[in-house]
């Protein structure tokens, strides 16, 4: 993926979008071009960040924006401005709460199971799980397979035992890029989590960088992570690995440099539960 695409997929465009939109809100009505241009740029940047939410929430947000921009005479400017500002700060507050790396809680472990696709299985070089195994001095059971999606991950989860107490999921990218319908992805992910989230097991999952047509993927991930008490690593961390210098061999699969960065990220994220 290009740096520009990864910037939007990481969700980082939300924050300059908020700034532009608020500048438009504060611009005097006697400057209609500035007000309109700043507002539209802000809206595009915010929507392009793909905050995971149901489509009806996007509809309400855009509707409030249009009410503010093309305010009917019976609606006061103060009321329209207040409605839009509240909507903007609601989105901002929700996403800021999802921005930080979660503090992963659970019993300390010396082993880790990984269920993933080619990003974790590795292609043409050392995989990040292999690098992590040596750098952290832990035992890793890497069940990942190239081309795997959430349906394939069910078979991987079946290979786990009661002694596997720490699981990392890096799955869903092939579903997203392969055009799997969002509802099918959600059903597959729920089936996987029902299988994987056993009592006494800590489960961590990478949030997927998103594109506008697949926002429902992110919404399903967050909803199911809450339901099954899964720790979700925010998408910006994964996107930062991919957009680093020389991080990928083909724009998507990790190079040796990218694999080392991914291993360092996972080691940092799991540090509270790895020994």
Predicted segment positions?
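Serine-esterase "nucleophile elbow" of acetyl-processing enzymes
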Residues: 90-167
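Active-site segments of SGNH/GDSL-like serine hydrolases
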Residues: 170-174, 189-222
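Catalytic-core regions of hydrolytic enzymes
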Residues: 145-165, 176-197
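Solvent-exposed loop/turn segments at secondary-structure junctions
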Residues: 118-121, 145-151, 173-177, 209-214, ...
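Short, solvent-exposed loop/turn segments at secondary-structure boundaries
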Residues: 123-126, 179-183, 215-216
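Catalytic His-Asp segment of secreted/periplasmic serine-dependent ester chemistry enzymes
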Residues: 46-57, 177, 210-275
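Helix C-cap/helix->beta junction micro-motif
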Residues: 136, 199-200, 227-228
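N-terminal secretory targeting modules
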Residues: 1-113, 122, 134, 250, ...
């Amino acid at each position: 993926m290009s740096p520009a695409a990864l910037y939007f997929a990481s969700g980082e465009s939300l924050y300059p979008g908020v700034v532009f939109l608020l500048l438009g809100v504060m611009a005097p009505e006697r400057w209609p071009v500035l007000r309109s241009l700043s507002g539209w740029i802000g809206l595009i940047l915010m929507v392009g960040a793909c905050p995971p939410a149901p489509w009806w929430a996007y509809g309400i947000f855009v509707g409030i924006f249009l009410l503010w921009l093309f305010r009917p005479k019976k609606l006061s400017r103060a009321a329209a401005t207040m409605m839009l500002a509240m909507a903007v700060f609601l989105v901002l507050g929700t996403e800021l709460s999802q921005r930080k790396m979660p503090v992963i809680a659970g019993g300390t472990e010396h082993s880790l199971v990984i269920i993933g696709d080619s990003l974790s299985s590795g292609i043409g070089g050392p995989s990040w799980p292999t690098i992590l195994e040596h750098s952290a001095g832990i035992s890793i059971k890497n069940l990942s397979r190239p081309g795997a999606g959430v349906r394939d991950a069910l078979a991987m989860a079946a290979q786990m035992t009661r002694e596997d107490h720490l699981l990392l999921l890096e799955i869903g990218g092939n579903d997203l890029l392969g055009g799997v319908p969002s509802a099918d992805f959600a059903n597959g992910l729920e089936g996987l989590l029902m299988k994987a989230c056993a009592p006494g097991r800590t489960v961590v999952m990478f949030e997927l960088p998103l594109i506008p047509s697949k926002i429902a993927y992110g919404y399903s991930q967050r909803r199911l992570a809450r339901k099954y008490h899964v720790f979700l690593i925010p998408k910006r961390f994964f996107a930062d690995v991919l957009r680093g210098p020389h991080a990928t061999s083909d724009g998507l699969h990790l190079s040796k440099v990218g694999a080392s960065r991914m291993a360092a990220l996972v080691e940092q994220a799991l540090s509270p539960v790895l020994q």
